[in-house]
From Swiss-Prot:
This is 2-C-methyl-D-erythritol 4-phosphate cytidylyltransferase. It comes from Bacillus subtilis (strain 168). Keywords: Isoprene biosynthesis, Nucleotidyltransferase, Transferase. The gene is ispD. GO terms for biological process: isopentenyl diphosphate biosynthetic process, methylerythritol 4-phosphate pathway. The lineage of its organism: Bacteria, Bacillati, Bacillota, Bacilli, Bacillales. The keyword Nucleus does not apply. Belongs to the IspD/TarI cytidylyltransferase family. IspD subfamily. Gene3D superfamilies: Spore Coat Polysaccharide Biosynthesis Protein SpsA, Chain A.
Length: 232
């Protein structure tokens, strides 16, 4: 089944300390967002990419898309005040009922195989997310004082893409807007609906989100490793 993907790209990423949109930072000579777009552009099931941007950066994005031509249709949509509002605006650009993915622009290492598994699950259940089991011990801390050690066996770190039937996610966003609910991800909006259910597909630990300067070092290492594997 074909799908559209909504990619929020309006955030400034303050933890990256780059003084600009972190998606414009270059990895191996190309901006982060270009690496991410290439994944979906080369995936045969992707019908359309909806890039949700800060309106003040529209010309910059237009120039990037001119410098790096893509075969897949890419639509630029002005975002909102919060990520959730931006995604909702992006969803409104999807023209027909289908599976829709929501993906962080700063996750350039998602693989086609993972997307395929995610779509297959969403087709069956309506909502599916990528996640990986937590490897580290997790503690709840207040004022630098440990208050609780949390049992990690049932804890998973959630990633993107997240996949949904369009009608389900639109309903979830509409309900959240009506209730004034601001979720941490799109799956949380479905979860807060009556009867809302989200399935998990195991992802990969290399599907990192570039959030801090240290993540750029990790990203370069991942790219070096993947480049080396291609020549084995």
């Amino acid at each position: 089944m074909s799908y559209d993907v909504v990619i929020p790209a309006a955030g400034q990423g303050k933890r990256m300390k780059a003084g600009r949109n972190k998606l414009f930072i270059e990895l191996k000579g190309d901006p982060v967002i270009i690496h991410t777009l290439r994944v979906f552009d080369s995936h045969r099931q992707c019908d359309k990419i909806i890039l949700v941007i800060n309106e003040q950066e529209r010309e910059h994005f237009q120039q990037l898309l001119s410098d790096y031509p893509f075969q897949t249709s890419i639509e630029l949509v002005a975002g909102g005040d919060e990520r959730q509002h931006s995604v909702y605006k992006g969803l409104k650009a999807v023209k027909q009922e289908k599976i829709v993915l929501v993906h962080d622009g700063a996750r350039p290492f998602i693989k086609h195989e993972q997307i395929d598994e995610l779509i297959a699950e969403a087709e069956q259940t309506g909502a599916a997310i990528l996640a990986v089991p937590v490897k580290d011990t997790i503690k709840r801390v207040q004022d630098l004082q440990v208050s609780e050690t949390i049992e990690r066996s049932s804890l998973w770190a959630v990633q993107t893409p997240q996949a949904f039937r369009l009608s389900l996610l639109m309903k979830a966003h509409a309900e959240a807007e009506r209730k004034g609910f601001l979720g941490t991800d799109d799956a949380s909006l479905v979860e807060q609906m009556e009867g809302g259910s989200v399935r998990v597909v195991e992802g990969s630990y290399t599907n990192i989100k570039l959030t801090t300067p240290d993540d750029l070092t990790s990203a370069e290492a991942i790219m070096e490793s993947e480049s080396g594997n291609k020549h084995v």
